[in-house]
């Protein structure tokens, strides 16, 4: 590190959604901020699905926006398709959702952080906190560099002792292809704090050219799209279509027969999963009476050849995933992206 920032008011650990909002919030309050991230280029990177908002989450994005946050603006500037969910119900449960270009979203947020005065971005891994008289006064990086500050905000997300499960295979990582953060959890536990583990899943990414699009149904956004941010004035986003398909009995049988190979059912994973995003194996098990489940094929960026399989979040072995998806009409010859 060429220069260690000084006179920092607020130091934020982690450059995901929460870390970005915390850093910018401190800046709006006139504080000098420092964002420590393991990879400067990954600030604002969307780990999972290429979307902002949705049921429950959409309301949160709006609330963040009212408080001056950047997420709504970033979504409005990178959106490929906008839709209000639950429109058939009362307005209190209407939920805004945007399909976004992951690359444009990341670039927008990265530029916002790097071009804001009084914010310093430091590339490094925080392994412990510095304490003085039971008060946090700074952090220590893995390379032993110390950064002093008035306050520390931890927004490490899935990276704290991150562990990826693919069937019986376990990979230590924050997200696929990126190392997890190790050492900080152990330090916090040594202070008497209790650690727990949450579980989230992600579906395989499909190669667009291996899909038979003629067997899918086009799903467009709203004809009169609504922006997330009240600060967005001019708003004429594209309406890039997604596509829907449905699982079937054969797909369900393939998954059901391999449930014991899913960490959720083998006992390897005991964490609580997100309520509004159950895994495909959980849906097959809990709703055995259902003959089909909807899957949404979503582009990860404009003209993307990498397709996100919304509705097929899973931790099953890769071969089982591929076999189950190839049982679905339109995906008979599907191939996975391996990056």
What spans do the regions from the language model cover?
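Glycine-/small-residue-rich beta->alpha transition segments that form the dinucleotide
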Residues: 151, 156-160, 316, 329
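Flexible, glycine/charged-enriched surface loops at secondary-structure junctions
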Residues: 198, 265-272, 331-339
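Conserved beta-strand-loop-beta-strand element in the redox core of flavoprotein oxidoreductases
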Residues: 130-146
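A glycine-rich dinucleotide-binding beta-alpha-beta segment and adjacent secondary-structure elements
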Residues: 308-339
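Beta1/beta-strand and adjacent pyrophosphate-binding region of the FAD-binding site
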Residues: 4-18
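Conserved N-terminal/central alpha/beta ligand/cofactor-binding core
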Residues: 6-7, 24-128, 155-172, 179-185, ...
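Core beta-strand elements of the Rossmann-like FAD/NAD(P) dinucleotide-binding domain
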Residues: 8, 142-151
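Long, low-complexity segments enriched in small/aliphatic residues
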Residues: 217-301
């Amino acid at each position: 590190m060429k220069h260690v920032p000084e006179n920092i008011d607020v130091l934020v650990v982690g450059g995901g959604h929460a870390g970005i909002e915390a850093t910018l919030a401190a800046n709006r309050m006139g504080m000098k901020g420092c964002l420590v991230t393991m990879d400067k280029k990954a600030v604002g990177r969307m780990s999972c699905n290429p979307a902002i908002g949705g049921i429950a989450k959409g309301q949160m994005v709006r609330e963040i926006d009212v408080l001056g946050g950047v997420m709504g603006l970033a979504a409005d500037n990178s959106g490929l398709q906008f839709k209000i969910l639950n429109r058939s119900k009362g307005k209190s449960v209407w939920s805004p959702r945007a399909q976004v270009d992951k690359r444009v979203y990341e670039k927008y947020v990265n530029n916002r952080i790097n071009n804001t005065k009084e914010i310093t971005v430091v590339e490094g891994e925080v392994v412990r906190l510095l304490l003085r008289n039971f008060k946090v006064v700074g952090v220590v990086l893995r390379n032993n560099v110390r950064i002093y500050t008035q306050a520390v905000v931890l927004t490490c997300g899935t990276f704290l002792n991150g562990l990826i499960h693919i069937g019986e295979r376990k990979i230590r990582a924050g997200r696929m292809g990126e190392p997890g953060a190790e050492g900080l959890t152990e330090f916090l536990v040594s202070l008497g704090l209790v650690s727990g583990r949450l579980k989230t899943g992600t579906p395989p990414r499909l190669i667009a050219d291996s899909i038979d699009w003629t067997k899918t149904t086009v799903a467009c956004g709203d004809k009169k799209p609504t922006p997330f941010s009240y600060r967005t004035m001019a708003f004429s986003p594209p309406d890039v279509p997604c596509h829907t398909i449905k699982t079937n009995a054969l797909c369900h049988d393939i998954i059901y027969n391999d449930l014991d190979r899913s960490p959720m059912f083998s006992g390897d994973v005991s964490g609580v999963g997100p309520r509004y995003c159950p895994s495909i194996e959980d849906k097959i098990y809990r709703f055995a009476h259902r003959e089909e489940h909807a899957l949404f094929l979503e582009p990860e960026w404009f003209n993307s050849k990498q397709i996100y399989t919304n509705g097929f979040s899973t931790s099953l072995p890769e071969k089982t995933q591929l076999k189950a998806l190839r049982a679905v009409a339109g995906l008979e010859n599907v191939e996975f992206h391996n990056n």
